Amino acid sequence: MSSFNPHLKFQSQAVAKPYFVFALILFVGQVLFGLIMGLQYVVGDFLFPLLPFNVARMVHTNLLIVWLLFGFMGAAYYLIPEESDCELHSPKLAIILFWVFAAAGVLTILGYLFVPYAALAEMTRNDLLPTMGREFLEQPTITKIGIVVVALGFLYNIGMTMLKGRKTVVSTVMMTGLIGLAVFFLFAFYNPENLSRDKFYWWFVVHLWVEGVWELIMGAMLAFVLIKVTGVDREVIEKWLYVIIAMALITGIIGTGHHFFWIGAPTVWLWVGSIFSALEPLPFFAMVLFALNMVNRRRREHPNKAASLWAIGTTVTAFLGAGVWGFMHTLAPVNYYTHGSQLTAAHGHLAFYGAYAMIVMTMISYAMPRLRGLGEAPDARAQRIEVWGFWLMTISMIAITLFLTAAGVVQIWLQRIPADGAAMSFMNTADQLAIFFWLRFIAGVFFLIGLVCYLYSFRQRGRVPVVVAAPAAA
């Protein structure tokens, strides 16, 4: 923040850089723990008892959530000042919150790794307000309180920025999504003793995040980048955004019912959940049409080709992961057999990567050259390396999804469909899936190589040369 950056419209946008950098560091950690878990699937005692599978999985999923949150916050700190046409309300507050959130995140992960979970719960006085022990919400209560404090400070900062500046559809949708993210997280503090009731409130956090308000955040970030790289009129893009978020909210909120099939809810949810969750691919399909339409109607050739590729890629991959693979097992008669199988893991991996990891990397790809003082785009070599990273990660994730899908089909065929006496046991079924898990691990290694390419592209210091017209002859 101390040095002037001529490539930023507002100097306070520079606070986004540490958020983006830390997000990518956590992303590397998530992938590494994913590879460890992938190997533990086929080499059961790998790193045991130093790093049990359940601990590796907890770190893997928590890193996913936290790095995406850092990415969303960095995106907001970059786009909100530009959309509001004014400086960020308090850059100093943004930096303070960064260090608070980063410290809380690192300490929590270290706690998972070096302290037995029961001891961690006792150490952090979970008995005063029990919130621990649930998937994705394993954080100690003190960490959850810290997340709420950081979220409130963050929303105050960008909210005050919006109030004193211009109001646009993009910034309003982004703010709505971020407020929803904070509000729905509050359900994490309610942990009823009744397991059926607990599952309802757990899904109010998990589902209404990833299939609800996070889609608003994704839509706003995508719209912002497309405005910048295509030059299409803002009014056209905003109309598309209205349609997309309306579909996302209607299908996403009522579509929560597909999680109510087997947790003790009334039978009507078998129909409601199936019908509305079958409509959930629509907003993702609309995003594909939106991105392709805007690129075809572009009024300028933006020099950052890599960012444009990420913008299109995130819509297509999100539609495949969240739309196609989500629909595969969302209808109640099908979900009866597929629930909790490797097919669920296939959907989860491609959906999270396509919808949220890729949109954060899209934003970083667009913003980082400016944040690093390089102008609109890095040089051609850096972009080639980044494009290699895009294709390696995306193809590898699709391969991971296909291998997990094959594993899920075999698992369902051997373990779920046969009658009780003929069904194969869980562990015996797992032995039959080893080939798919080995292939998944190999694809994961290529994914890591792609991520390294993406990160290495930012080490290039070159920039796109500016062509200056020669002076006219006298």
UniProtKB/Swiss-Prot annotation:
Q: Give me the Gene Ontology terms describing cellular component.
A: plasma membrane
Q: Which family does it belong to?
A: Belongs to the heme-copper respiratory oxidase family.
Q: Which organism is it from?
A: Stutzerimonas stutzeri (Pseudomonas stutzeri)
Q: Per its UniProt record, what PROSITE patterns does this chain match? A: COX1 (PS50855), COX1_CUB (PS00077)
Q: Which GO terms describe its biological process?
A: aerobic respiration; denitrification pathway; electron transport coupled proton transport; respiratory electron transport chain
Q: Where are the transmembrane segments?
A: 19-39, 61-81, 95-115, 145-165, 169-189, 207-227, 243-263, 270-290, 308-328, 348-368, 390-410, 433-453
Q: How does it assemble?
A: Heterodimer of cytochromes b (large subunit) and c (small subunit).
- Functional pathway: Nitrogen metabolism; nitrate reduction (denitrification); dinitrogen from nitrate: step 3/4
Spell out the InterPro entries in the cross-references: Cyt_c_oxase-like_su1_dom, Cyt_c_oxase-like_su1_sf, Cyt_C_Oxase_1, Cyt_c_Oxase_su1_BS
Q: What induces it?
A: By nitric oxide.
Membrane topology (UniProt): Multi-pass membrane protein
User: What EC number(s) does the entry state?
Assistant: 1.7.2.5
Sequence positions that bind heme b 2; high-spin: H347
Provide the catalytic activity annotation.
Answer: nitrous oxide + 2 Fe(III)-[cytochrome c] + H2O = 2 nitric oxide + 2 Fe(II)-[cytochrome c] + 2 H(+)
EC top class, as a word: oxidoreductase
The subcellular localization recorded is:
Cell membrane
Residues given in the record as heme b 1; low-spin binding sites: H60, H349
Molecular function (GO) terms for this protein are: cytochrome-c oxidase activity; heme binding; metal ion binding; nitric oxide reductase activity
Query: What is this protein's function per UniProt?
Result: Component of the anaerobic respiratory chain that transforms nitrate to dinitrogen (denitrification). NorB is the catalytic subunit of the enzyme complex. Shows proton pump activity across the membrane in denitrifying bacterial cells. The mononitrogen reduction is probably coupled to electron transport phosphorylation.
Query: What does the entry list as the binding residues for Fe cation?
Result: H207, H258, H259
Q: From the Swiss-Prot or TrEMBL record, give the protein name.
A: Nitric oxide reductase subunit B
- Keywords, ordered alphabetically: Cell membrane, Electron transport, Heme, Iron, Membrane, Metal-binding, Oxidoreductase, Respiratory chain, Transmembrane, Transmembrane helix, Transport
